[in-house]
Regions:
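Contiguous, small/hydrophobic- and glycine-enriched helical/loop subdomains that border
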Residues: 1-93, 120, 124-141, 145-156
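A generic structural signal for short beta-strands and their flanking turns/coil linkers
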Residues: 10-12, 59, 95-99, 114, ...
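Glycine-rich, charge-dense phosphate/pyrophosphate-binding loop(s)
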Residues: 137-221
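Short, acidic (Asp/Glu-rich) active-site segment that either coordinates a divalent metal cofactor
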Residues: 88-122
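Short, acidic Gly/Pro/Ser/Thr-rich loop/turn segments
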Residues: 21, 103-106, 198
Length: 221
């Protein structure tokens, strides 16, 4: 069960609606990148906003495949996306992208032990609401530009997204467990991020499994 845990005045919660061609959404070779591009741009927005105010990150901000934002091995936030039809617009659909971040939540008020807050992994930050607005501006500007490029040439931008995501993917190289919707699981090491945004997991027998849709958790050492 996945739920949002929000602390008023200490969290960043936003939903953004974007319009995307139906052809891209239906193209399984590129559509997996839409949510990940949103995550990549949110990471860039966080890092950029912290630097804008003279802050310092003590931990790298990374992305856990496919939709979580991590810092110091703990969850800082998450990104979700949902497709919604646009009435009387057959060639485009809306995608609602939701983001939740812990900005100034104290350690003792975090919802779970495996979560963290930006104030716990960075120093010299401004007021949480000032930082929130700066992150929002950077994210919207960056995402607007990336999605425009993606619509212009989705296959070119999929390559670009993979190149950007691979070095900041926290999941890669780690032992993980994938939970599928049918109740089955798969354990192994995440070894590659593929052209279509799927994840390759190598099991204990050396068999490679391509995972497109699953809840993938990193196993404790």
């Amino acid at each position: 069960d996945h739920t949002w845990a929000i602390v008023p005045g200490e969290s960043f919660i936003v939903s953004l609606v974007v319009s995307v061609p139906v052809a891209i959404v239906r193209d399984s070779s590129v559509n997996g990148w839409l949510q990940m591009i949103a995550g990549c741009e949110m990471r860039e927005a966080i890092v950029g906003a912290v630097c804008d105010f003279g802050g310092t990150l003590d931990e790298d901000v990374l992305l856990k495949w496919p939709n979580d934002i991590f810092a110091g091995g703990k969850k800082l936030g998450g990104v979700l996306a949902e497709m919604v039809p646009i009435p009387d617009c057959g060639d485009r659909v809306a995608i609602v992208i939701g983001v939740g971040l812990n900005l100034a939540v104290a350690q003792e008020r975090l919802p779970i032990d495996k979560s963290t807050s930006l104030q716990l992994v960075a120093r010299n930050l401004p007021d949480a609401m000032v930082l929130r607005d700066a992150i929002a501006v950077r994210w919207v500007q960056g995402l607007r530009s990336r999605l425009a490029d993606f619509e212009e040439d989705p296959h070119r931008e999929a390559v670009r997204a993979r190149e950007a995501m691979t070095p900041i993917c926290w999941t890669l190289g780690k032992q993980c467990e994938a939970h599928f919707v049918d109740g089955t699981t798969l354990q192994g090491r995440a070894v590659a991020l593929n052209d279509d945004a799927s994840l390759t997991i190598e099991d204990q027998e050396g068999v490679l499994h391509r995972v497109s849709t699953a809840d993938v958790g990193v196993l404790s050492k």
